[in-house]
């Protein structure tokens, strides 16, 4: 069945889309509320600006895309059939492409921010501020919008996918311009994801080195805790995003290097995974919120601290006993 021009939904239930929509909206709102509460207790930072932008982008994705799918199921029409010239399909594809690019770009900037704050603190304090974060977010949005309007100018195309409630870039384009466009999209995702992973690994190595240097002095545990609070959610979200985007990148490269035979089931699985990251991101921040991390950090360090205290107590007791015996011998 050719789903490109299908106007009526052949089958399917809106329950999955409704659950995804509810989970995305509720999760992002809860995460934003918790972030605002934390911001009022502490001074706002560049990291908080970037996290807020990430959550707002995910919330925008849930609000702008999911209601369209629910409306399609309610009318029994596909995205192409909901408008005369497939405007709804183009709108849906534009949003999916924009949100995937902007979310990944923000994650990459967050990873770079963490690396600079730990690896190059002097440069970070001197040159980076919240204003840089606002400018960076604006530039990311602008660049993503410019890229996503290219299909309206003849580079690439937004097409409908099975079962008629999904629209995205044509991953099996036969024309050279379309292949270059979708190839650039996949390559950009691959490069930015690799940069994010490298930055996170570098931050992790720096934290391990800091921990080893400071364990012997029993100091700076507070700063270590704060860095772990920032790194753990970022690393988790990066893993989630890789799992959600890598299948789509692989599908694009397979279509570019192989035949142009359409595989609707594989394309649909890749698109569904792509939409999951905006739902999972806020729940990562909710579960790995700083208060919970502090509790876990204290519990992990309590056995070590108690062991150190017992060791100090035994040493002091042995020293006092030795001094007492020595004084008796002298007498």
Question: Whereabouts are the PLM-identified features?
Answer:
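Helix-to-loop junction signature of class
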Residues: 17-21, 34, 60-79, 100-106, ...
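Seventh transmembrane helix
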Residues: 243-253, 266-312
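Fourth transmembrane helix
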Residues: 71, 102-109, 116, 122-165, ...
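Loop architecture of class A 7-transmembrane GPCRs
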Residues: 2-3, 76-93, 97, 146-191
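Intracellular effector-coupling site of seven-transmembrane GPCRs
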Residues: 48-57, 205-248
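Extracellular TM2-ECL1-early TM3 structural module of rhodopsin-like
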Residues: 9-18, 46-109, 117
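Extracellular N-terminal segment of 7TM GPCRs
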Residues: 1-30, 34-37, 331
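Intrinsically disordered regulatory tails of 7TM GPCRs
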Residues: 1, 37, 212-231, 291-331
């Amino acid at each position: 069945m050719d789903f490109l021009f299908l106007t009526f939904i052949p089958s399917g239930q809106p329950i999955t889309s409704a659950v995804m929509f509810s989970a995305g909206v509720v999760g992002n709102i809860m995460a934003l509320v918790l972030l605002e509460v934390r911001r009022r207790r502490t001074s706002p930072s560049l990291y908080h600006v970037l996290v807020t932008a990430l959550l707002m982008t995910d919330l925008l994705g849930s609000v702008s895309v999911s209601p369209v799918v629910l409306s399609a199921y309610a009318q029994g029409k596909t995205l192409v059939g909901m408008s005369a010239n497939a405007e709804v399909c183009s709108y849906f594809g534009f949003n999916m492409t924009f949100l995937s690019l902007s979310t990944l770009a923000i994650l990459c900037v967050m990873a770079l921010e963490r690396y600079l704050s730990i690896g190059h603190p002097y440069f970070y304090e001197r040159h980076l501020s919240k204003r840089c974060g606002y400018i960076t977010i604006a530039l990311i949005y602008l660049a993503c919008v410019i890229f996503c309007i290219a299909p309206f100018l003849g580079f690439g195309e937004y097409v409908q996918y099975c079962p008629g409630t999904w629209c995205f870039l044509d991953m099996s384009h036969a024309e050279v311009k379309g292949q270059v466009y979708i190839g650039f999209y996949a390559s950009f995702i691959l490069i930015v994801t690799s940069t994010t992973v490298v930055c996170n690994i570098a931050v992790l190595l720096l934290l391990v080195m800091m921990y080893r240097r400071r364990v012997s002095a029993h100091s700076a545990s507070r700063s270590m805790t704060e860095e772990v609070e920032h790194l753990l959610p970022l690393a988790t979200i990066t893993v989630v995003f890789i799992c959600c985007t890598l299948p789509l990148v692989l599908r694009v490269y397979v279509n570019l290097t192989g035949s142009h035979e359409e595989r609707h089931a594989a394309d649909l699985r890749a698109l569904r995974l792509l939409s999951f990251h905006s739902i999972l991101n806020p729940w990562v921040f909710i579960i790995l919120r700083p208060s919970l991390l502090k509790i876990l950090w204290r519990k992990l360090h309590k056995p070590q601290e108690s062991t150190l205290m017992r060791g100090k107590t035994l040493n002091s007791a042995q020293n006092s006993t030795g001094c007492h015996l020595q004084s008796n011998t002298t007498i």
